[in-house]
Amino acid sequence: MKKEMWEIENKYFLNATSQRFAKTIFHYEIFKKIAKIKGDIFELGVFKGNSLMRFVNFNEVLKAKKKFICFDDFGDFSMTGKSKDDKKFILNWRKTTGKGININSLKKKLKKKEIK
């Protein structure tokens, strides 16, 4: 597992754009501002789980002790009753981004971090 983690991390740093780094820094700066404020974190739309896991890690690093409440349908966007433009957007979104994380995979990742 450790070797796999190193390989994944190395691939990320070798291939990530400055936009990806900026997003991580932006999320960190936001989390620092809220770390000491009372309350919990709500993630509305988990998608692939990246920002959720980023915030979970920031929570550990900054010892914020926040609770995370996450919502998602863990499935594809529905095409039922959508306009032509919405359907076009959804199809392009699927093609560009792929599928989101399924709930069982997310639960496994959270369990490794001892999060329910």
PLM segments and residue spans:
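S-adenosylmethionine/decaboxylated-SAM
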Residues: 2-18, 28, 35-116
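N-terminal pre-P-loop "Q-motif" helix
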Residues: 22-26
